[in-house]
């Protein structure tokens, strides 16, 4: 099995609770097809670099996946059909890291600076 990182962006009018359930549904789909999931991160509502489908913001999610290519193909097919998902990207990686992603680390750094002042 190969290792992948799957990042997707969901419309801004979706609630954070719905985004969490979407992450859980994605995890269930991967495990149902015989894959395994590693860390799952919800990055929150973030500004987009450019407009996508008239949206300036989006909810970001990241899932580390250990699965065969057909599982990834099915996941991407379902996300293309979903009205909530406005962008998705799957990257093949050599190894998964256990530490939080750079996006979450940057958020924590900013929070720490505010507390010192």
UniProtKB/Swiss-Prot annotation:
InterPro entries: Ribosomal_bS6, Ribosomal_bS6_CS, Ribosomal_bS6_sf, Ribosomal_S6_plastid/chlpt, Transl_elong_EF1B/ribsomal_bS6. PROSITE patterns: RIBOSOMAL_S6 (PS01048). One of its GO terms (cellular component) is cytosolic small ribosomal subunit. Keywords: Ribonucleoprotein, Ribosomal protein, RNA-binding, rRNA-binding. Signal peptide: none annotated. Residues 97-117 are annotated as: Disordered. The keyword Ribonucleoprotein applies. Coiled coil: none annotated. It comes from the Bacteria. GO terms for molecular function: small ribosomal subunit rRNA binding; structural constituent of ribosome. One of its GO terms (biological process) is translation. Disulfide bonds: none annotated. Pfam families: Ribosomal_S6. CDD domains: bS6. PANTHER family: MITOCHONDRIAL 28S RIBOSOMAL PROTEIN S6, SMALL RIBOSOMAL SUBUNIT PROTEIN BS6M. Belongs to the bacterial ribosomal protein bS6 family. Binds together with bS18 to 16S ribosomal RNA. This is Small ribosomal subunit protein bS6. It comes from Maricaulis maris (strain MCS10). The gene is rpsF.
């Amino acid at each position: 099995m190969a290792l992948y990182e799957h990042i997707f962006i969901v419309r801004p009018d979706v609630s954070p609770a719905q985004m969490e359930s979407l992450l859980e549904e994605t995890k269930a789909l991967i495990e149902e097809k015989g894959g395994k999931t590693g860390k799952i991160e919800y990055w929150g509502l973030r500004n987009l670099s450019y407009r996508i489908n008239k949206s300036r913001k989006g909810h970001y999610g990241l899932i580390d996946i250990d699965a065969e290519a057909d599982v990834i193909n099915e996941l991407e097919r379902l996300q293309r059909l979903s009205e909530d998902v406005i962008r998705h990207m799957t990257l093949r990686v050599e190894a998964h890291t256990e530490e939080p992603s750079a996006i979450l680390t940057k958020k924590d750094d900013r929070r720490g600076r505010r507390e010192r002042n």
